């Protein structure tokens, strides 16, 4: 009988690096949507609520503070919500406030920052709060880019403000037709061997 063993230096306790990809031993990917306002959100939630997939939302704290009930609704639907900072930026002054807001809704620790432009200052802010910094494998990929660059453990980010809701089914078919499953960010980053 073999026991599962994590690496000596586990990524979940090391905040110095960007996480560009999840576990490559599992054919799973994570899809992230950035939420900055409600323009596209209600239609999108109606659309994906009919599907059996796990979507991850990084929510702007400015929008969140005015839409706490909507965030509770998203959490109750089974979606994970995370801190996008203020206007997509993390700074020393406001990260505590936005983390407290997220944690009061999810009843979980805020543990991820989203950093699409590899901003080292923001990574350091997140590191001091013991938050892992996600640098997605793909940002707003077209269907062709998704087909060409899909790999085990991919973390795919879309901006919900500019996202075409009619494309979600094509995106999911592209992913699942290649044998991948869409999972929660926590599950994709998990270092356990599958």
Segments and roles (model prediction):
Residues 12-15, 96-97, 164:
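Short amphipathic alpha-helical surface micro-motifs
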